[in-house]
């Protein structure tokens, strides 16, 4: 019986890539800088002391970071016994965004340039805005700028509730984000607006990766909170991923936990499980692992590392999240059968000590564990697609166009 369990710690980079200069990210190091802050006592808010990740260390995380950067992260044990196979991988794709990283993990790198809304003010073309107002019968709109999602809610949330005007905003990523209040605007109405925006972006040839619904609750600035009803409307991958091949060629199953299905535009997904927060995502993953049959992938995205702590530049929160993940990791490992493989990885970096609020161009860890997986270094991987090619070989699907099998 062949089963693979893929856990993406969203934004968990382990050191700047060779091409980081192109992105303004030379020196970025999500893991390294979190560990450094913890070791210096600068991340003691809600947690305390050096970064404590014994289980990830046993799977090779510290060694993978050493391969990427040349040093073991501060406070981590570089001499611990390693029971898994580990690598550090470079991104072939042109961007440092979520779809590019995930698609490349599944064997399909993004070799074209996404479209971006690069102006920080008046970010969106007037023609696009006019069509959205007309088609969705809107009283207008707010925002039309670059912003962090939590900041813009404090700035415009109250006005949105009074006027019914949706909040449009973007970032350095290829995204069009729409924030609306779940109760005063309505969740279904927000989703419908996002569908219209997706259509107009496609019809207008803007080549934008995702439209993201950002629902929130609360009654005034300072207590607005985004909810777990976020929805990403992505374009479809440009070629069949290893997920699609497993379903089509092997009649396999691919279970999405969290936002995986959204990222792949539901392509190659046979079951979707919603969950919000690290513990709930863990619980849902464990349930699906227990029920998984032959030729099954259970694929989970742990988005909080990125959305709650990376973008918000919350070092202590990120560290506490990693430590929670590490404490629960043995629960996953104990469920593995003889032929199973567990892959822990990331899709890009988001260094919480870095300037700004955007992603960082970094190597990702590739930690592979299973009863039959030989421990040790798998070295520097030239593309995340090596993960997809490894899965293609493991499940016996046709080869992926990109990537080399790691074992």
Swiss-Prot record:
Q: How is the cofactor bound?
A: Binds 2 manganese ions.
Q: The organism sits in which domain of life?
A: Bacteria
| Entry binding sites for Mn(2+) 1 | 10, 347-348
The answer to keyword ATP-binding applying to this record is: no
Q: What is its EC number?
A: 5.4.2.7
The record's top EC class is isomerase
Write out the GO MF terms: magnesium ion binding; manganese ion binding; phosphopentomutase activity
Reaction catalyzed: 2-deoxy-alpha-D-ribose 1-phosphate = 2-deoxy-D-ribose 5-phosphate; alpha-D-ribose 1-phosphate = D-ribose 5-phosphate
One of the GO BP terms on file:
nucleotide metabolic process
Q: Which GO terms describe its cellular component?
A: cytosol
Gene3D superfamilies, alphabetically?
Answer: Alkaline Phosphatase, subunit A, Phosphopentomutase
Annotated compartments = Cytoplasm
Q: Which UniProt keywords apply?
A: Cytoplasm, Isomerase, Manganese, Metal-binding
Q: Which InterPro entries match?
A: Alkaline_phosphatase_core_sf (IPR017850), DeoB (IPR010045), Metalloenzyme (IPR006124), Phosphopentomutase_DeoB_cap_sf (IPR024052)
User: Which PANTHER family does the entry link to?
Assistant: PHOSPHOPENTOMUTASE (PTHR21110:SF0)
NCBIfam families, sorted = deoB, PRK05362.1
Any idea what this protein is called? Phosphopentomutase
Q: What is the lineage of its organism?
A: Bacteria, Pseudomonadati, Pseudomonadota, Gammaproteobacteria, Enterobacterales
């Amino acid at each position: 019986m062949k089963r693979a369990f893929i856990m993406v710690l969203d934004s968990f980079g382990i050191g700047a890539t060779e091409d980081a200069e192109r992105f303004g990210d030379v020196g970025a190091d999500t893991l390294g800088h979190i560990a450094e802050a913890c070791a210096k006592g600068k991340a003691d808010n809600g947690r305390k002391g050096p970064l404590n990740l014994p289980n990830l260390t046993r799977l090779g995380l510290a060694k993978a970071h050493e391969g990427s950067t040349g040093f073991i992260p501060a406070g981590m044990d570089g001499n611990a016994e390693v029971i898994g196979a580990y690598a550090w991988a470079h991104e072939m794709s042109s961007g440092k965004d979520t779809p590019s990283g995930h698609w490349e993990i599944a064997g399909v790198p993004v070799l074209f340039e996404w479209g971006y809304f690069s102006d920080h003010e008046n970010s969106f073309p007037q023609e696009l805005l006019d069509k959205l107002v007309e088609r969705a019968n809107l009283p207008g709109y707010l925002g039309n700028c670059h912003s962090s999602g939590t900041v813009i809610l404090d700035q415009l949330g109250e006005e949105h509730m009074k006027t019914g005007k949706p909040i449009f905003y973007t970032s350095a990523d290829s995204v069009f984000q729409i924030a609306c209040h779940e109760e005063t605007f309505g969740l279904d109405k927000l989703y419908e607006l996002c569908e219209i925006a997706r259509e107009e972006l496609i019809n207008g040839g803007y080549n934008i990766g995702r439209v993201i619904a950002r629902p929130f609750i609360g009654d005034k600035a300072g207590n607005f909170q985004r909810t777990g009803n976020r929805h990403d409307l992505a374009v479809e991958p440009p070629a069949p991923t290893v997920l699609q091949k497993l379903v089509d060629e092997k009649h396999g199953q691919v279970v999405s936990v969290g936002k995986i299905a959204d990222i792949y535009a539901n392509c190659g997904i046979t079951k979707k499980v919603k969950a919000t927060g690290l513990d709930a995502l863990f619980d849902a993953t464990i349930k699906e692992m227990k029920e998984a049959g032959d030729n099954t992938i259970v694929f989970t995205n742990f988005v909080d590392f990125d959305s709650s702590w990376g973008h918000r530049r919350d070092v202590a929160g990120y560290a506490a999240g990693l430590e929670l993940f590490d404490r629960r990791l043995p629960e996953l490992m104990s469920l593995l059968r003889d032929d199973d493989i567990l892959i822990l990885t990331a899709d890009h970096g988001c260094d919480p000590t870095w300037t700004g609020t955007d992603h960082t161009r970094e190597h990702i860890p590739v930690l592979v564990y299973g009863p039959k997986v030989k421990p040790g270094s798998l070295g520097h991987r030239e593309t995340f697609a090596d993960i997809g090619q490894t899965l293609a070989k493991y499940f016996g699907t046709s080869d992926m166009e990109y990537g080399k099998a790691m074992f």
